[in-house]
A protein has these predicted regions:
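P-loop NTPase catalytic phosphate-binding loop
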Residues: 1-113, 119-226, 244-309
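Extended, compositionally biased alpha-helical segments that mediate assembly or anchoring
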Residues: 225-236
Length: 309
């Protein structure tokens, strides 16, 4: 059909990604379906354990993301922490404050990097997860305080890997004692790519171009993917420290008269964990664990690291 042209629709995560899926109450299921596909796209494309979800679902208390809950239930306990579910205004407010602080910390502490993706590219053994903030039945339970913080996160959040998905239920009105809420909402939407839910599919606004989203996985595909994902996460959890990372530039020059840091292994966030000797620290430690738990290996690492430093 020469009268029809299909083009790929892709988002560049180096730029702000704020997606608003709009529809009336009658299209609520379709809006959830669209969000479902976005979640699936992120899980499928992002490295294992490198995407964090913050879900605000005031109407169903997590029921809107049952697919994600079922998926995470198959994951190790450590990965379940990567999904935060909220339903109350104060919970959303607290989450937004945390995300805004996270953004400001990144801008202050890592000025040499364009964004989190740039940081990850230059630090492959220290990669950090991106965050997908999803608000269902928006703007239900989101008062003016939330809208102000949300606007800040949407404008700066991509700097530290935060992306926002809004499921805008047009039947919901903002209930707030604050002034100019409608203006805040309109300003916020200017920073969004908008997709409208219709009975016959999805349309990209303001052009009303038809959009065909990726297909949802069936139960078998999701089960297979969850098993593979689980294996990938477990593999990531078993890491060792490279000798090059603990070798000091000038061996044998350390001194406990000041501060002596002895690299010991890999900790949370793939960061190097060190045992510190010197001013303000304790020179005593207790190593506990069952048979075969690695006590001797840890002592060997401590001895070798001490000798090299």
């Amino acid at each position: 059909d020469m009268s029809r042209v299909e083009l790929p629709m892709m988002f560049n995560l180096h730029h702000p990604l704020n997606l608003e899926v709009i529809g009336p109450e009658a299209q609520r299921d379709n809006m959830q379906s669209a969000a479902y596909r976005v979640i699936w796209g992120f899980l499928r494309k992002c490295p294992a354990s490198k995407v964090r979800f913050c879900i605000f679902d005031p109407k169903e208390g997590g029921g809107s993301v049952r697919m994600l809950s079922n998926f995470v239930n198959k994951m190790p306990d450590s990965y379940k922490k990567a999904v935060t579910q909220m339903s109350r205004t104060e919970e959303l407010l607290s989450c937004l404050k945390e995300l805004e602080g996270q953004t400001l910390d990144f801008i202050r502490d890592r000025p040499d990097y364009d964004d989190l993706l740039d940081y990850n590219a230059h630090n492959p053994r220290r990669t950090e997860a991106i965050t997908l903030l999803m608000l269902y039945d928006f703007p239900l339970n989101a008062d003016a305080r939330c809208l102000e913080l949300l606007s800040s996160v949407m404008q700066k959040g991509n700097k530290c890997g935060i992306y926002v998905i809004l499921c805008r239920n047009t039947a919901v009105e903002v209930a707030s004692s604050y002034d100019h809420v409608d203006e805040k909402l309109a300003e916020l939407e200017k920073n969004c790519v908008q997709i409208e839910c219709k009975e016959n599919g999805f349309a990209l606004l303001p052009y009303h171009l038809s959009v065909r989203l990726i297909e949802k996985p069936d139960a078998g595909q999701l089960e297979k993917f969850a098993v593979e994902y689980h294996k990938a996460v477990e593999k990531l959890n078993v890491q060792s420290i490279h000798f090059e990372e603990i070798l000091p530039p000038e061996p044998f020059q350390g001194s406990t008269a000041k501060v002596l840091k002895l690299p010991m292994g890999i900790g949370d966030g793939d960061s190097v964990v060190s045992m510190v000797f010197g001013e303000g620290t304790s020179h005593h430690g207790l190593i506990g664990g069952g048979t075969g738990g690695g006590k001797s290996t840890l002592l060997h690492t401590l001895i070798m690291s001490s000798m090299m430093n």
